[in-house]
Structure formats: C-alpha cells, structure tokens
Amino acid sequence: MSHHGGAPKASTWVVASRRSSTVSRAPERRPAEELNRTGPEGYSVGRGGRWRGTSRPPEAVAAGHEELPLCFALKSHFVGAVIGRGGSKIKNIQSTTNTTIQIIQEQPESLVKIFGSKAMQTKAKAVIDNFVKKLEENYNSECGIDTAFQPSVGKDGSTDNNVVAGDRPLIDWDQIREEGLKWQKTKWADLPPIKKNFYKESTATSAMSKVEADSWRKENFNITWDDLKDGEKRPIPNPTCTFDDAFQCYPEVMENIKKAGFQKPTPIQSQAWPIVLQGIDLIGVAQTGTGKTLCYLMPGFIHLVLQPSLKGQRNRPGMLVLTPTRELALQVEGECCKYSYKGLRSVCVYGGGNRDEQIEELKKGVDIIIATPGRLNDLQMSNFVNLKNITYLVLDEADKMLDMGFEPQIMKILLDVRPDRQTVMTSATWPHSVHRLAQSYLKEPMIVYVGTLDLVAVSSVKQNIIVTTEEEKWSHMQTFLQSMSSTDKVIVFVSRKAVADHLSSDLILGNISVESLHGDREQRDREKALENFKTGKVRILIATDLASRGLDVHDVTHVYNFDFPRNIEEYVHRIGRTGRAGRTGVSITTLTRNDWRVASELINILERANQSIPEELVSMAERFKAHQQKREMERKMERPQGRPKKFH
C-alpha cells in the first residue's frame, strides 16, 4: 500500500476471512518472533484473503516495507473496536506508526500482520495491546470478572482459549435450597394457622358398614377412590347420602339447599363432602353436570367463615377458584350468589370484562375470587390483588386449563398463595398432565372419580351417529332442526368460529331464530346470547368448543355435533351438555371421511354406553386401520435394510 501524506488507504485494514477448503482453523498462538521467522511463503493468504502467492501484499510493497511482518493473534471480538467506526482507529494507528496492518478474521481468534520497520512494528503492536488492555479493564470493571479474557491454564501448563481462566467458585446447590426454604418460612411466618377440619359425622353415616358403603358406591355410577398419600393409607369416609348427613351442624347451608329444591346430593357430592370437610385435599374426576361445583363451594363457605383470623375482619380474599373460561367463571359466581352464606362477598375476574371495574371491586374487599388465570395473573403482577391470605384453593376443570396452555399463569399465581392451604381440583378426565399438576400443587390428596378413569361414557344420553359427506352435512342438520318440537333446546357444536357465523347467518336468513357463542364475539354479546338461550328466547345455540365446558343449561334436550371435535375427550364433554341433573338427552353426530381416525375410539365409547353402532362407522374404522397398516408397510419398505457391508 502506498502512503500519501502518511495516511494509508482504507483498503489496507479491511478484514479478510481465511478458510481452508475443508474446515476453518484458528491461527496458531505462536510468539511474534517465531512467526517472524516465516519467510515470504509464510504469509500467503487463503481463499478469502486480500492477496495470493508468495509476494508481499501490494500495499506493503508499494510502501517499501522489506521486513517480514510481525504476526500475532487477537481475540475476534476485539476486531471491530481495533478497526473503529469507518476504520478510524486502525487508520490512526497506521498513520502514527507508518505501518501497514492486515487483519485476517477467524474464530475464536484473528491473525494480525503488521508490515513496516521492526521499530514501527513493535510500536504499532504496543498501541494495539494497550488499547485491548483498556477494553478488558473496562469490561471487567462492569462485570466484576477480572479473568474474562485470559486463557485458563491446565495442570500441564497448556492453555485453553475457550475456557475462562481462574478458579471458578463452585455453586453450592444444597445451600441455595436451604436458603430458599428459609425464605419461604420467613415469607409465611406472620400468617395465622389454618383450621381445616369442620366435619361431624352423622349417626346414619357412621352406622353404615363397609359392605353397605361399597354397595352404595357401586350402585351410584360405580364410584371408586384412591388415597395418594405415601405410606399408610387412610380409610375413605362413608358417603353422606342426604344433605342432613353432611351439613347437620350448618343450618344456613341447609336452608339454602332447601330453597334450591334439591332432593338429595349427587354421587360425587356424597363422597366428596366428607373428605373436603375434614380438610383433606381432593381430586374429583367426573363428567360435567354431576354437581362438582357444589362439591367445593359448600365446604369452602364453611371453611372461610370458621377461620379464626376472619372473624369480624374479612377484608382480604380467603378463597380462590381458578377456571379455564369466563363462562365457567360467571357460572361459579352465579352459584356463589345463589347459595350466599354469612354475607360472604365474591368477585369474578376474567379477560374480556371491564378491568377497571374488577379492580374497584377488589379494592372494596372480597372473600372469594373466581377468576381465569390470564386476567388474575395480570392483576397479580400489577399488585392489584393480594393472594397471601388464600387458605382454600380450587382448580376447576384442571384438564381444560392445561389444554388451553394456562399452566405458566397457574404457576405464577400459586407462588403467592400460602403452601399450607387446602386445595380441591376437579377434572372431567385424568390424563398424565393433570396427574402431574396434582403432584405439584396438592398435598396427600384423595381422588374420587365416577365411572372409569380414562373417559366417562355418558349413559344418560342417546347417541346417534350419521356417517355422511361434507356436502350432505348441512341438509342433515336442516332436517333435524325442522323436526324439533317447541320444547326442544339444542346446542350445535362446530369446529371453527367462521363456521358458527356462517351457519347462524344462513339459519337467520331462513327465519330460524338462533344465537352463536364463540371467542371472537364481544363479552356482552356472549353473555346476552347465553342468557337468551337459558331463558328460552332462542332454542338453538351454535357454539365452538369454548362453550363445551362451563355451559350450565339444565334443560338442553339435544346436542348436535355438526363438526366432530379434535379428540374423543371433547366429544364426551360436548354430549355431556345434555342429559344433566337426572334427565335424559339425545346427541346427533355427523362424521365424514376426514374424521375416520377417531372412528375406532368412538366405537369404544358407544359400546361402553350400550349404544347402537352403525355399520358405516365400523366400516370406516376398518378402512382407517387398513390405511394405517399400508402406510406402515410403505415406511418399512423405504427404510434401508441393515448397514452396508464394508469390504477390506
């Protein structure tokens, strides 16, 4: 490079990239003297360099530099700083030292070559070394690490440039755990103890023999149970067959039950109440519409009112109910108001509702919070709600909350709930994900479930299956709607919001009064649609799976599955919207070839519920099985048969 007025051209310092034809290799860290012994052949640059061959770079030749270059390694993350903005830094070094500097960039270190007289080479290197040293000092002062850029030295004296030098302090995980436990104890130390056991067994319940109790459970939907406590198992309490057996000591609860007109507890209530009233954590697995809400609400009311710390000062929430959807949250709040006890105040907190109004209600002081995880987590992170005094926690429809991806929000919420609380979990199914959640957040629970553990075949619903085509689905539904009587009430389930809107529009154009319920509608519109359906103003509701849980309308006579749900569990939940509270119901489901993957599972559900199975459905299941076998055979044929032999 020629000099004009002492300033080198910018092209001199442009970073080159040296790569071999196979693999990139970092330059060897050799002393400058050793590298300087390399002749003209030694500084030939590879494919990415600025020059080739055995000659010096043209800029160095033009400048009259006869000495061999001074070569040294530079950490690649310093290259940009050494060059400077627009090359300003390295131009200044070249100008003040009358040298030509070449940087060949590689990882983790780059090769620097300085051309010029020996004195100027040494001066230029000293300038670069001092500049890099200042960069290291600045970094170390900010990070508090004084060995960040120095190579570690092994026992044999070798260096490893990829390992930070110096003795690293070992992390004592046991100490960290101990400190975490101490912090937890300190966090909850000022809270009063919780009273949990409020159960007084009636004479009739205590007189029931084990044989009688087992016989009752078998006759009432085959109730089974398990104690998940480690070690010695606890005996399950006898079921409370009447409301008096459960709440004989709580006349106000009995009065509310009589006002509601209930005759006797549902099976899940009879078995769950003696457990929860004793303060034992509970997992209740049963189909929707079996009275699971009152399983936890009634004992929860008693739990709250009889806490010593709450007498005369209920200004902070003591009970928290988490639900997957706003519809279910509103339904639970409705039940709280219906069975109001001792002036307990509740608030419903959910996404889509007026956030400011919900905050104002919380500020007034409440006893019970019913919430969806997303909105409650939002208010929690904004310090609008204090969960420190929660002593009674409910995870309602836990399987649905996990399906909807709420586990991270649940985890954050429960960090602020005292660990010695009482917890009740309800679920329609018992998959591994719910089992794992129970292990994390419940302590030594008992599990009570109605029917089988995997799925509950709804025996109170007559299930009709129609195997058809996509083109014929609309006409089948029209035929059904035209055959409805004036007292029938139907929920039509569809897979997508757009389908719900499309069907609603077509039916309204045909002078058929309908309402639709899905997530894209405004909250007030959804509430109005649900109210119109409940009161009978409209008798046809078109809904997505959002409404397949928490939709509590007792007089639904039919469920029509226009689209088959994404899995067989949702099918069970959908048809569970009818045949509730001791009534019978009817479901109609249309299937097309697109649904043939679920045909076999659907047959199992129908068989367990003693339903008729159409031949077309059996044929569909057989075709899908044959299709799967064919694909598996094709995959096997495509796989290489063993390893190729090696010949020596």
UniProtKB/Swiss-Prot annotation:
It catalyses: ATP + H2O = ADP + phosphate + H(+). Residues 460-621 form the Helicase C-terminal domain. A motif (DEAD box) lies at residues 396-399. SMART domains: DEXDc, HELICc, KH. Residues 273-448 form the Helicase ATP-binding domain. Residues 67-128 form the KH domain. The keyword Hydrolase applies. GO terms for molecular function: ATP binding; ATP hydrolysis activity; mRNA binding; RNA binding; RNA helicase activity. ATP binds at A286, Q287, T288, G289, T290, G291, K292, T293. PANTHER family: ATP-DEPENDENT RNA HELICASE DBP3. This is Probable ATP-dependent RNA helicase DDX43. The gene is DDX43.
